[in-house]
Regions:
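N-terminal strand-loop-strand
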Residues: 1-38
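Residue-level detection of beta-strand scaffold positions
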Residues: 11, 40, 53, 57, ...
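Extracellular/periplasmic catalytic domains that process cell-envelope and extracellular macromolecules
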Residues: 13, 86-88, 106
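Short, charged/polar surface micro-motifs in flexible loops or helix N-caps
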Residues: 14-19, 27, 44-45, 73-78, ...
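Nudix hydrolase/Nudix homology domain
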Residues: 28-35, 91, 95-113
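The catalytic Nudix box helix
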Residues: 38-73
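Active-site segment of metal-dependent pyrophosphate-handling enzymes
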Residues: 62-101
Length: 113
């Protein structure tokens, strides 16, 4: 079985007494499966995890955010088995706040905010 490593980053976005979560599409085209979670996504080549977290929150929610701390507040590590491949994934989450109102429509993968 082949093995690879994957890295992602996301945001735990606080606004007043609320925490921002998104409902993601899951599965094949036309599937009605979904799940709620923090906005997150893959790091692009040469991108720092903190930069990826800010970018992903914006892409998935349309909100401009800033970090409350340069260090992640949580790290998640897990293994995904997909066909004949094992993916060892690490995700860093950063605490953030909204700095400007809704700027754009969320990505197509997002069903609800």
């Amino acid at each position: 079985m082949n093995s690879k490593v994957d890295f992602a980053a996301g945001g735990i976005v606080l606004h007043d007494e609320l925490i921002l979560i998104v409902k993601n599409k899951r599965g094949d085209e036309g599937s009605d499966k979904s799940f709620w979670g923090f906005p997150k996504g893959h790091l692009e080549e040469g991108e720092k995890p903190s930069e990826a977290a800010i970018r992903e929150v914006y892409e998935e929610t349309g909100f401009k955010v800033e970090l409350l701390d340069d260090k992640p507040i949580a790290e998640s590590r897990y293994e995904i088995r997909l066909n004949d491949e094992i993916i060892n994934k690490t995700v860093w989450f950063y605490e953030m706040k909204i700095v400007s109102a809704y700027q754009k429509e969320p990505d197509d993968e997002i069903l609800e905010i």
